[in-house]
Amino acid sequence: MTEEHVVLLDEQDKPSGTLEKYAAHTLNTPLHLAFSCWLFNEDGQLLVTRRSLSKKAWPGVWTNSVCGHPQQDETTEEAIIRRCRFELGVEITDLTPVYPHFSYRATDPNGIVENEVCPVFAARATSVLQVNSEEVMDYQWSEFKSVWKSLLATPWAFSPWMVMQASDEQARERLLNYCQR
């Protein structure tokens, strides 16, 4: 895969440049564009992934299915499809926004900051997973309600963005409705 960049955003969330992805994530990460996607299988189960230990931010924590950064001149939807293929080796369908205006800032235990405008989507996995071990060290298909209970009981075991996204009542309801259709 070619070197990835993040699209930097100004105070009005408008693109203001790019920066190499690894260089962007520091103790003082600038605001940038990202995405988060929750994948469901045909049985309505949610794919929860555990981030590789080689990840710069939040290594080894459990998180939603796939996250990433749209590249310059790439739509968020195109970026989600690209990252699903790269991280999970999976094709998707029925890509649906569930929390289009999500943004957050969080600092991991090593001091690395995430500072993102991060629209959240749900999608349906349509092929068998072929996980990239450089991105994902473990994964599990689980019932959404079971994952929600785990998020409430042990939020420290999950990425902060996953906890924040699921804690939004409207987003949680949209995810629940998505997995039941």
UniProtKB/Swiss-Prot annotation:
Principal EC category: isomerase
Residues that hold Mg(2+) according to the record: 87
Active site residues according to the UniProt entry: 67, 116
Pathway(s) the chain acts in: Isoprenoid biosynthesis; dimethylallyl diphosphate biosynthesis; dimethylallyl diphosphate from isopentenyl diphosphate: step 1/1
SUPFAM superfamilies assigned: Nudix
Predominant place of localization: cytoplasm
Keywords: Cytoplasm, Isomerase, Isoprene biosynthesis, Magnesium, Manganese, Metal-binding
Pfam families in alphabetical order: NUDIX
Domain Nudix hydrolase, chain residue ranges per copy: 30-164
Cofactor(s) the record lists: Mg(2+); Mn(2+)
InterPro entries to which the protein is assigned, alphabetical: Idi_bact, IsopentenylPP_isomerase_typ1, NUDIX_hydrolase-like_dom_sf, NUDIX_hydrolase_dom
GO molecular function annotations of the record: isopentenyl-diphosphate delta-isomerase activity; metal ion binding
EC number per UniProt: 5.3.3.2
Function: Catalyzes the 1,3-allylic rearrangement of the homoallylic substrate isopentenyl (IPP) to its highly electrophilic allylic isomer, dimethylallyl diphosphate (DMAPP).
Assembly and interaction partners: Homodimer.
Similarity section: Belongs to the IPP isomerase type 1 family.
Name of the featured protein: Isopentenyl-diphosphate Delta-isomerase
Underlying gene: idi
